[in-house]
Amino acid sequence: MSEIQKEEQETQMFRYKDAFLPIEERVNDLLSHMTLREKVGQLNQRLYGFRAYERKGDEITLTKETIEEAKYFGGLGVVYGLYRADPWSAKTTENGLSKEYAIKGYNLLQRCCLEHSRLGIPLLLSSECPHGHQALDGYLLPVNLAAGATFDPKLYKEAVSVCAHQLKQMGVNLSLVSALDVARDPRWGRTEECFGEDPYLCSCFAKAAVEGTQSEGVAMVAKHFCAQGETTGGVNASAARIGERELREIHLPAAKACCEAGVKGVMAAYNEIDGVYCHMNHHLLTEILRDEFGFDGIVMADGVALDRLQEAVGDEPHAAALALSAGVDVSLWDNVFPVSYTHLTLPTT
């Protein structure tokens, strides 16, 4: 049997491989072939991409942890920050993926994923883009507070599209962009991620960010949803002590503008609103975001937010169930989904 005949036979067996079929039909067929472990693997964004490899001179190798993760889950759903370089990641021009090594590193990781994916599911790559691409040789922009001070969302959109063009060339699928936070307390250490304190101005720039990013074929994940700038005492991730009126008048307009612009992703915020953590807030993530605003993309958790949720509710399976039921689709740096899978599959004696 020739290779072409093999491919045709495989396409007939696995309808999701038929590019001429509607996407929804292909997705449903793919899901029907997946095991529970493979499904959990697709929701799992546990790996730090900048720790997924080691570079010594011109040689790049994947870490044992990365390979084992791909083996166990039959591939990798989403990998965060492959190109990230800053003091936290400890990546520099000496050991990071600067432009001459970027594609080599990406291909190595993607090949590992595909080799261990029984169904040939490629990974998605997400990158931090608070003001341009947070990477070696990444295109950078002024921080949002400075961009907002220009009062020129059209110019900002053009600048963002240039950054997105580079992201596309580097294989990035999801650009994580701070676009939803409103400056409410200058003591908050992340105020520079806000476009300003005016909901209308923030909405205009949020819309520009979506249009600029997605014009280049890169999906944008707008963050953080919602009211993260409404901190108590300026403390990051603290409770937002607001009611429904302030939520809707101040903090939701930017999210609504993003949804109207067709944003593909939204990241939930660390904080709680009126005593309910955003990551388990069904009213926020489903009733408002999806039902009211018409959002039909993915909701991503913020970093280790589901692990923090586990600390609040008692155990991993409970945290996973609350997050998934509320509307969270993909984790970030968490152990909640993998640990919950282990609990679900333990033999009962």
Positions of PLM-derived features:
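Glycoside hydrolase catalytic-domain context in secreted enzymes
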Residues: 2-344
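A short, hydrophobic C-terminal helix/tail in secreted or cell-surface proteins
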Residues: 345-349
